A protein has these predicted regions:
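Conserved phosphate/anionic-ligand binding catalytic regions in large, soluble enzymes, centered on
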Residues: 121-138, 290-305
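Conserved small/polar residues in nucleotide/adenosyl-binding loops
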Residues: 1-6
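Phosphate-rich cofactor/ligand-interacting catalytic cores and adjacent structured alpha/beta frameworks
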Residues: 7, 17-107, 141-284, 288, ...
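Active-site cofactor/substrate anionic-group-binding motifs, chiefly glycine-
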Residues: 101-102, 106-121, 125
Length: 321
């Protein structure tokens, strides 16, 4: 608790019982923190997968537009990467320098995490986008907890911007001089859509301004958890320029999917039987078109993660009071 010898402190009764109690809880909390974060990440990733129905995506009813993965594939992948993503939170929590100096280290760790994912899934890309997005958000959450003693989506998104903006802007400048390697990079070179890089370097406004506030409101209104997740997914699809959809189909088809999501929301969304039936009908169309809004699914998982982290902090506050 202080730099003095513990025996001297004990004899002098320098620290109150309440101070000692709080310090003990802090030590226990820090020891359990990474395990707790890993559990929250696992829950967020699998909660997204099990959300049903979803258009073109793997869920409990079918595998959407995918023939190489199912719920079990995602379970294996989640088990392989959750601890690594939690370690990125720990890296942020222990980082003392500027956030932007942490990002190159996160990217290197992310490559190793991708290798674990591919090893677990037999080469299937289940969570590449998640590793990038949750890795950044987890590290930013760690920095937020260290610097401000709390985790709130607004501060996490702001720190994400501070952490990534400079390096990702450099990435995009270099990409302009090439034809791109990944699907997302090729789309940026041809269409100028920045994809996951653009979301990170602008501080994930869709999360902190739209999906997290909406999810918290739906939870406060005691809505069904699965329906909340379907609703949030529809809201994301309606707003996001999803490069996953573009890479599998075209920009025109992605705009069509946005329009369909908006129409379902207008018809009552996931909180109506009619809306859920329309999602199932849209799923069948997406399967025929080989269309999968994977970028939107990643942001649903990110939304769940941020809400769960805020709840985790509330539980911590309750323990310390």
């Amino acid at each position: 608790m202080c730099i003095r010898d513990s025996c001297q402190c004990g004899r002098s009764r320098k620290h109150s019982i309440e101070e000692l109690r709080k310090k003990i809880y802090d030590i226990i909390w820090e020891e359990q923190l990474q395990r707790g974060v890993a559990a929250e990440i696992s829950q967020a990733l699998m909660e997204e997968v099990y959300t049903t129905p979803k258009p073109g995506l793997v869920d409990r009813e079918d595998t959407g537009a995918h023939t190489d993965m199912d719920c079990q594939t995602f379970q294996k992948s989640t088990e392989a990467i959750a601890e690594d993503l939690a370690a990125m939170f720990e890296a942020g929590y222990s980082w003392e320098a500027d956030p932007e100096t942490l990002f190159p280290l996160l990217r290197e760790r992310g490559k190793k995490t991708e290798e674990k994912m591919f090893a677990a899934t037999g080469g299937v890309n289940t969570h590449q986008g998640i590793i990038f997005t949750i890795g950044i958000l987890a590290a930013a959450a760690g920095i937020s907890l260290r610097n401000y003693g709390k985790i709130e989506s607004e501060s996490v998104c702001r720190i994400s911007l501070e952490m990534t903006k400079k390096e990702l802007e450099q990435d995009l400048r270099k990409l302009k001089q090439s034809s791109g390697i990944t699907h997302g990079e090729k789309i940026y070179c041809h269409l100028g859509e920045k994809g996951v890089r653009g979301l990170a370097m602008t501080g994930y406004p869709i999360l902190c301004e739209l999906t997290v506030p909406h999810m918290k409101q739906y939870i406060a209104n005691n809505r069904d958890k699965n329906q909340i997740n379907v609703q949030i997914l529809l809201e994301i699809i309606a707003e996001l320029t999803d490069t996953n959809v573009i890479s599998r189909t075209s920009e025109k088809e992605m705009r069509w999917l946005q329009t369909e999501a908006k129409a379902i929301l207008k018809a009552g969304g996931a909180f109506s039987e009619n809306g859920l039936q329309k999602v199932r009908e849209l799923n069948q169309i997406c399967i025929r078109k080989n269309m999968s809004p994977g970028g939107a699914a990643d942001l649903l998982a990110a939304t769940i993660f941020l809400c769960r982290m805020e709840t985790l902090m509330e539980r911590r506050k309750g323990i310390l009071q």
